[in-house]
Structures are given as C-alpha cells and as structure tokens.
Amino acid sequence: MRFILCKYKRIITKKGDEAGVFDFFYLILQADELPFSHYFTHSNNAARLLFKDINTIKIMGKKIQFSLVYRDMWQSSGKFQPRKDQLVRIAPVFVEMGCFARVETNGGAFEQVCLLAGENPNEAVRAYCKPLHEAGIKTHMLDRGLNALRMYPVPDDVRQLMYKVKHAQGTDITRIFDGLNDVRNIIPSIKWAKEAGMTAQTALCITNSPIHTLEYYTKIADELIAAGADEICLKDMAGIGQPALLGKLTKAIKDKHPDIIIEYHGHSGPGLSMASILEVCNNGADIIDTAIEPLSWGKVHPDIISVLSMLKNEGFDVPEINMNAYMKARALTQEFIDEWLGYFINPSNKIMSSLLLGCGLPGGMMGSMMADLGGIRQTINNLRKKKGEDELTMDDMLVKLFSEVEYVWPRVGYPPLVTPFSQYTKNIALMNLLTMEQGKGRFVMMDESMWGMILGKSGKVPGAIDPELVELAKKQGREFTDADPHTLLTNALDDFRKEMDENGWEYGQDDEELFELAMHPEQYRNYRSGQAKKNFLADLQAAKDAKLGAKVSPEEAAAFKHAKADAIVSPVKGQIFWEFQGDGEALKATEPFIGKEYKEGDTFCYICTPWGEFETIPAALGGQLVEINAKQGTKVNKGDVIAYIQRPEA
C-alpha cells in the first residue's frame, strides 16, 4: 500500500442544467493492480460539497493495460497460424514494444491448425511463451469450455489434462467461454484450471437480443465469480455489443465485485469497437485486447496505436509504444503473410461492414460464408431461370441471407452467434433460402449438429425454441434434453494411451503428446504419419497457383513458376515409376507430394524402358518439388518434362 498525491483536471459533473469542470487534489490509497473502486479519495472542500457520491464523478487517470491478441488476429484473418520459427522471431519484438502486459499465444484455432500444417503445436507453445515469460508478460489462451480446443464436446479427463499441459508449457491464463453462455459448460473448467495453477478468466459472449439484457449478463457474471472465476472477459466476438450496454455491464460487475479484473475483447467489423472501448474504460475495465498492423482493423481488432492514443487523451494512464519495435513487428507480420500465410487470408476480412449489425454474425466467418453463399446462389439462380424469374446478384443473396438469419435466430432460442453456434444458425438460414426457392418451406434441411443445438445437447439456449420447431422435433422422433452436457461424455484417456502404446508413440513431456491425440485425434494421426504436411504443401502450392493464375495467363504463370526451377527431363522413352511401394505399410505407390525436398544427386524417379531396363533419374541440383507433370505409371517420351524442382536460395 502507498499514498500518492494526484491532480486530476477533468472532473465533470452534471446537476440539472448546470455542468462544471473542476481541478482538485486528492490522496489515493493505492493497492497494486486493484481497480479504482478500491481507492479512497480525500478531495478539496469544493469538490466534496458538490459530490456526495464519488460514483457521480468521472475520474480520469486510471491505469489501463493492453493485450496483443496475436492468435485471434490470424484466426480472424485466415486459416493458419505462424510456425514456431516465426513466433520465436517475433516474440522478443512484442517485448521490445513495451506496451503489452499480455499476449494471446495459443488455444482454439491454434493447436489444431498447427497440426493441419504438419507442425507440432506443443513445441511452438513452449518456445513462443518462453521469451514473453522472461520479460514478465502474461500469456493467455482461448478455451471453448465444454469443447475445449475443438468444435465438439470433450470428455472431462481430457479437459483436465489440457490445463496441466498448457500451464506446464507456459500459458498463464485461460479464457473460458461457452457459445451458449451456459455456466454448466464453464464451471468445471474454472476448477480444473485453478488446480493446474492457471488464472481462470471466464467470458460473457456479448450479443444483442431481447434476451441478452444487462440483468442477463450480470446474473451470469455473478454465478461465474461465485464458482471461482478470477477475471471476467467481455467477449464481443462480432463487435455488435452496444457501447452503452457494455459500459453499464462493466460498472455493474465492478460495483458488486470490485476485485475482479475485467478485460474487453472486441472486433472492429461493424465499427462500434472504439466507442465500446471508451465506454468500458470509463466504467472500470482494466485490460483491452488490441491488434497491430497489417492485420488490425477490417473485421479483426482495433490497432494498439489508435486505442492507446484515444485513452491517453481521455486522461487514462497508459504505457508508451516503442514505435521502432512496432514497425519491426509490423514488418515481420507482413513477411509472414508474404511468405505463405497470406495465401489463406480472405481479402474481404480487411473490409468493415455495418451490415454485420443486422445479422450479428461474427466477422471471422464472413470469408467462408461468402464462399457458401456463392455456391447456393448458383443453385437458386438455376431454379429461378426455370421459373422465368430474374437471377439474384451476390448483393441480393447477402441481404436475403442476413434477413433470414434475423428470422431464424429468435426461433432457435437466440444462441450467441459465436463458434460453433454462429455457423449452425447461418447454415439453417442458408438451407432455408434454398428449400423455400424449391417450394418446400423452411427448416427442411437440418443436420445433426443443428438439431443438437436446438435440442439442448450442447447446453441450454438462452431463449425459447419456436413451437414450430418443437412440433417438428416430435414428428421426427427427436427428444429435448436439459442434462448437464459434460455428464453425457465418458472419459477417454485410457483408450488414447492404449493407441499410443500400440503405435510406440511417446506420451511426451508432461503428457503433451497424449493430450494432442486425445484433443485432435484425426489431425494428430495425420501429423504423425506425415500426411498432414503433404496435404498442407499441396494446398499451399494450389493456393499459390490460383493467386498467380488470377493475374496472368497460364503461359505467363508457368514461366513465372518455373523461373527459379529446373525441369527434370526424361532421357528415354518409357513408363514413370516414382516409387515401388508406398511410404507406409499397405500404402500404394504414388507420386511424391508437392514441397518435398531433394538434395543434389538424390534419386528422383525411375523410368522403365521398352526393353525392360530401369533408368534412374537424379534430382539435378536438388531443391523443392513445385510441379509434377507425369503421374505414377504414365508413359513419357524422350525429352518430356517430368517435373520441376525449385533450386534452394543461395
């Protein structure tokens, strides 16, 4: 504890039609990291006479901290996350910037996409967190509660292991949220996270509906705090939270729970985020999530420079930014985009849109939604042409979809539009557009995941299910449930231990490899077999080809692609054999994957001549395979190009 003498200039009051701005001195008894409601003031007589209630005074000067949500920046922009080597390069630059108390390092949409890229997420998290820890920066992860790090429910024993593993790897804070705001899906995680030594930050998924009121959110916050939550995050995942409500919610939580740290997470898509940040800070928020260029703004997050400038000029105590380090982090992020991550980024995610306010869909899913909409549009227009009706443009379809989401959302119980329930709600609306065009009506094409949300298998939706859907469920023999979702699952770790033992796989440090298999079984198996890396490199090459092909002719694209590559030419006529058996037991022989590395003089392939001899074809000067022109078993003539290998950089 310490006393600090402070002078605040912007003390604003309003009483009737009279307003005043006063300067005064006061002492505050400051306890480190406590919110303002813990400070006791001793103002001058004029101020004390004017204000009987300190809450009527707008106090400027509260300390605000910032988190860099680097993981979510990438998730909201595209498909993949930076590799371990890239994260290790940029982490010290975040430290050098000097303005971040926290960095979001991992969690949902990090570990899984690492595996999809053929990378080990455990190694990445450990290496990434280390320099941040050494500098005193706290690390945090995204945690989907019942679904943990994936899109469907996870057994209790796997969820418990997750917190032990992630804390051992260097993650300090877990941000636990549930897409339905069902506290039953969050409360067990609070206990397990704290037992593992982590800070349990629980999230309120913010949206706008007649159900999602101030009272609704404060009740959930009370329940989570009573269950042991250390912090509260206002997770404004679509950026549609109204600033006034967010300010009132922040104040309501702080008034009742002054020790609780409040962190605000918003997206910039609909354009409300800066106003929301100002409101929550003026009402007691402690930490604000921010981004950096070139991935800030659009449908992602506000940039730290703008947020810090706004709050500083409002009178808050904020850190300075080392702009040289900011520009270094900006350049490195752009380098990562240019190297490969940009091929999986949808350009539309850089565009803000007020249309998001109407439907409430999160910005991060707009890219995939537009792709889905394009496919449905073609089918709908074929139907309309047969009926002699005008075709619909993409803009027409977008307005129709947003209107249908507004129709569907209340009827399925107002689930907060966040993963995975935003996808389910959007898909119901999309299928409705198609079936209505076919003359079949609504709610005809719904899969098990959509019904699971409606029936309560993932938790309780906030609102009432429409009677039409209740009746439809009865007709189809479906049953509603109010059971606690996590009690419907059986423990699974023993089965995964058995699988690892049978394969001769190590459990890994702190059982981290066992955890990855249990959390992402299919992706982990593909990672271990090498298939994930093959698939990823093929997808990357296809994305590069598509981007290049959109700008130039096929001939120009080929010339550009082959500029740094050596053509592997057949010296004889014959049949191509890339290999004589597959890469693994019982796998058929096939051509290699795009991206495979060769050293100078390595055997590249074989050609069986018409006279029965096998000609060994070397890999020229070596490098990376970028194109295959002859499949396994095809016939080639002398002089035909078999493939291209890109030479390594000098």
Where are these regions (language model features)?
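Terminal or standalone catalytic/regulatory effector modules within metabolic enzymes
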Residues: 95-113, 348-356, 360-566
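Acidic, low-complexity mobile loops and tails
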Residues: 552-606, 613-618, 622, 627
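Conserved, mostly hydrophobic/aromatic
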Residues: 73, 176, 232, 284, ...
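Catalytic cores of alpha/beta
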Residues: 216-220, 271-283
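Positively charged N-terminal leader segments that act as targeting/secretion signals
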Residues: 11-49
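Active-site beta->alpha loop and helix N-cap motifs at the rims of alpha/beta catalytic domains
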Residues: 107-220
